[in-house]
């Protein structure tokens, strides 16, 4: 990958965010998702590359998707693998709530974890705690370690957990330590990445979410030097979701085996989920969130707010882009 390709990858998430934002607040979850998917696919098709989707959203709940194994790009140029979520937080977008964004991770061929659209147990933490907290330890142990690594009292820590029935025991354990919980309804990528930046007020992400977002988060956290671990969840009894009502543990294990995953219980480090020499994360806000603003529509332009994190040059670029409309007369500075 080079800087020209990374710039085009930024434009991919910008276009997906704009397409989805046009349906924000209309209660049309699937339509917003489909619009983002098609915009992302169209812009990827204009890039001179041999692109491939290795993990994406949609397989779990039959949403529109860029499917696993789909080839994107012009068909010539460098080989690039993608993990994508064109509309992260579809419910958030549908009801114009904070935290929805278009996101992806990209790497050279073979550089991203290839898995079905399953669930994943995740642990994200700041760089100071990297290699010290561990997903195999209890929440209580990890919170104590976090407190020591960050120099904060336990009751000063904020732990983000998705508000799901499957997390009832986890939430109770965290509260018993005295740490503070920030429950989120959807979209854990921003929470994971926020752990990699100082001053966000987010100190840890714990719990089970979607696997594609886990790979995307891992790519960002690897470039940031933060801690991220993931472990696939294949048992419907653990996932506790209606989306898996017709799925079985045995069937899910067979699906993993088909994709070459011989150790379904393996704990993956960020460097294994995003193992390529060059890895980048790109995200663009659909609605306002912790890391960036949502899409803003004006008479003469559309404004997007985005973030690109890359280990190619060890940079984090916060980008505000003005997309000028045809026939524009006057563009405000901000």
UniProtKB/Swiss-Prot annotation:
Biological process (GO), any one: glycerol metabolic process
Record-annotated membrane-spanning stretches: none
Gene3D superfamilies assigned to the protein according to its UniProt record, in alphabetical order: 3.40.190.90, Fructose-1,6-Bisphosphatase, subunit A, domain 1 (3.30.540.10)
List of residues binding substrate: 88-90, 119, 164-166, 186-188
Keyword Hydrolase appears in the UniProt entry: yes
The reaction(s) this protein catalyses: beta-D-fructose 1,6-bisphosphate + H2O = beta-D-fructose 6-phosphate + phosphate; D-sedoheptulose 1,7-bisphosphate + H2O = D-sedoheptulose 7-phosphate + phosphate
EC number: 3.1.3.11, 3.1.3.37
Enzyme class per UniProt: hydrolase
Cofactor: Mn(2+)
Pathway connected to this protein: Carbohydrate biosynthesis; Calvin cycle
GO cellular component: cytosol
Keywords: Calvin cycle, Carbohydrate metabolism, Hydrolase, Manganese, Metal-binding
Presence of keyword Hydrolase: yes
UniProt name for this protein: D-fructose 1,6-bisphosphatase class 2/sedoheptulose 1,7-bisphosphatase
């Amino acid at each position: 990958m080079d800087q020209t390709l990374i710039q085009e990858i930024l434009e991919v998430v910008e276009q997906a965010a704009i397409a989805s934002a046009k349906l924000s607040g209309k209660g049309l979850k699937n339509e917003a998702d489909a619009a983002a998917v098609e915009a992302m696919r169209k812009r990827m098709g204009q890039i001179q590359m041999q692109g491939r989707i290795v993990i994406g959203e949609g397989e779990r709940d039959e949403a529109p998707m860029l499917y696993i194994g789909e080839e994107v790009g012009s068909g010539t140029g460098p080989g690039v693998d993608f993990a994508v979520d064109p509309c992260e937080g579809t419910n958030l977008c549908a009801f114009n709530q904070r935290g929805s964004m278009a996101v992806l991770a990209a790497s050279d061929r073979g550089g991203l974890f290839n898995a079905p659209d399953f669930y994943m147990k995740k642990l994200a933490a700041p760089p100071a705690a990297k290699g010290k907290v561990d997903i195999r330890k209890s929440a209580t142990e990890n919170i104590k370690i976090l407190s020591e690594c960050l120099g904060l009292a336990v009751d000063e820590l904020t732990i983000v957990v998705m508000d799901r029935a499957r997390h009832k025991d986890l939430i109770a354990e965290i509260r018993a330590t005295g740490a503070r919980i920030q429950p989120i309804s959807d979209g854990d990528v921003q929470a994971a990445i926020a752990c990699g930046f100082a001053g966000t007020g987010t100190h840890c992400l714990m719990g089970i979410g979607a696997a594609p977002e886990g790979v995307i988060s891992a790519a960002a956290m690897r470039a940031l030097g933060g801690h991220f671990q993931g472990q696939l969840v294949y048992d419907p009894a653990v996932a506790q979701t209606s989306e898996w009502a017709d799925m079985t543990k045995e069937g899910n294990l067979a699906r993993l085996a088909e994709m070459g995953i011989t150790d379904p219980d393996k704990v993956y480090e960020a460097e294994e989920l995003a193992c390529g020499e060059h890895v980048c994360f790109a995200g663009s806000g659909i609605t306002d969130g912790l890391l960036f603003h949502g899409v803003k529509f004006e008479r003469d332009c559309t404004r997007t707010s985005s973030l690109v994190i890359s280990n190619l040059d060890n940079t984090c670029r916060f980008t505000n882009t003005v997309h000028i409309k045809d026939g524009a007369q006057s563009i405000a500075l901000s």
